From Swiss-Prot:
Family, similarity comment: Belongs to the MinE family.
UniProt organism field: Syntrophomonas wolfei subsp. wolfei (strain DSM 2245B / Goettingen)
Role this protein plays: Prevents the cell division inhibition by proteins MinC and MinD at internal division sites while permitting inhibition at polar sites. This ensures cell division at the proper site by restricting the formation of a division septum at the midpoint of the long axis of the cell.
UniProt protein name: Cell division topological specificity factor 2
Database matches in NCBIfam families: minE
Example of a GO biological process term: regulation of division septum assembly
């Protein structure tokens, strides 16, 4: 019951709010760049997987965006780096 009241008063937990905000952002990007939200999410997950092999990153703060300007689309990524991993052959 308290959960319902908190949601009605706009006090839903930050996790749900962040997830909803991310989903909305993906939908808006889809509209601007004609790319499905699933495609952009898969791209983001693949970037995280590859970068994680070389660096320690803050996945919570990672932002991947498509910017559409006139006749071009740019992939813009803001990836906070916590540290670098040592190469296996060093």
């Amino acid at each position: 019951m308290l959960d319902i009241i908190n949601r009605l008063l706009g006090r839903e937990n930050a996790g749900s709010r962040d997830i909803a905000r991310e989903r909305l952002r993906l939908v808006l990007i889809h509209d601007r760049a004609s790319v499905s939200p699933n495609f952009l999410n898969a791209l983001k997950e693949e970037l995280i997987r590859v970068i994680r092999e070389y660096m320690e990153i803050d996945e919570e703060s990672l932002i991947v965006d498509l910017e559409n300007e006139e006749n071009s689309v740019a992939l813009v990524a803001n990836i906070p780096i916590r540290g670098f991993k040592r190469a296996a052959n060093e």
